[in-house]
Amino acid sequence: MLLDYFSQLPYPIIFCVPEPIFVMVTVVIPARMASSRFPGKPLVPIIGLPMVEHVRRRALMAAGVDQVAVATCDAAIMQAVLAYGGNAVMTKPSHERCTDRVQEAMLQLPGEIVAMVNGDEPLLVPDAITQVITPLLEHHELDVVNLLSPLETEADYFNANIVKAVCDQYGSVIYLTRAPIPFFRYRTSVPVYRQTGIMAFRNSFLSRFSMLAETPLEKTESIDMLRVLEHSIRICGVVANYPTLGVDQPSDIALIENVLGRDPLQRDLLKQTLVSAL
């Protein structure tokens, strides 16, 4: 009936089909040499390749990613990345928070969605990046997504170097802390998560974030995402499909290499990493 009506009109009708919206996704890897617990960490060799280069090559494997860049304030890191054919941008040395370094890097890079992957995540599973960017692509009201990983040992629960996360029943992060939370007054099945260094943001949000003053809890705990929570901005927590293990101190390198040798998925990713095109 409707088509008959249009066919009788004295002038042609042109139906405009909107073009699909392309959203560029950029991965930024913040890395610096001046780690208090592990100086020079990004360039420490793992199976013959600098740690940051493991992370960069794995990030390039993630579905939905358009480009990857390392953000650093150290010429040695920049030269190493460029020598392997990667992209790197220089940032100010004054940044104390990874997120602020990523925001400055994005002033030099295109992209509507920004995934941040810390340079000390050599066991990065590319799917983890896809996990954090997907909610931003599907839910326009979200600005921040953080990948969480279940805590596996009691030692990790009490380790102040591991940031714990608690979420509400809808998956939003309630709080992040170095303290052991939740406190188990009674034995329950409540999961305990650790924050990972894998997050995603809208680039427009990063600009706003950089203009927000550091907050009391952020300074107290030295956790940059507390600035987001203290300004009542929602952080969507996504539980990792695969366990993550970052490098915090020199002794962690042996653990990383052990996992690379015995875990089937990690062995396969290592092969791809070592032979990946630059």
Where are these regions (language model features)?
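Intrinsic-disorder-associated, low-complexity terminal segments enriched in Asp/Asn/His/Tyr and depleted
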Residues: 4-5, 11
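Cationic, low-complexity basic patches in intrinsically disordered or flexible, solvent-exposed regions
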Residues: 9, 20
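N-terminal glycine-rich phosphate-binding loop and ensuing alpha1 helix
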Residues: 24-72
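Short, high-confidence coil segments that cap the C-terminus of an alpha-helix
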Residues: 65, 111, 140-142, 233
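Short phosphate-binding loop-to-helix
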Residues: 69, 75-134
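Conserved core of the sugar-phosphate nucleotidyltransferase
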Residues: 125-215
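Conserved alpha/beta core of the MobA/IspD/sugar-nucleotide pyrophosphorylase nucleotidyltransferase superfamily
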Residues: 190-278
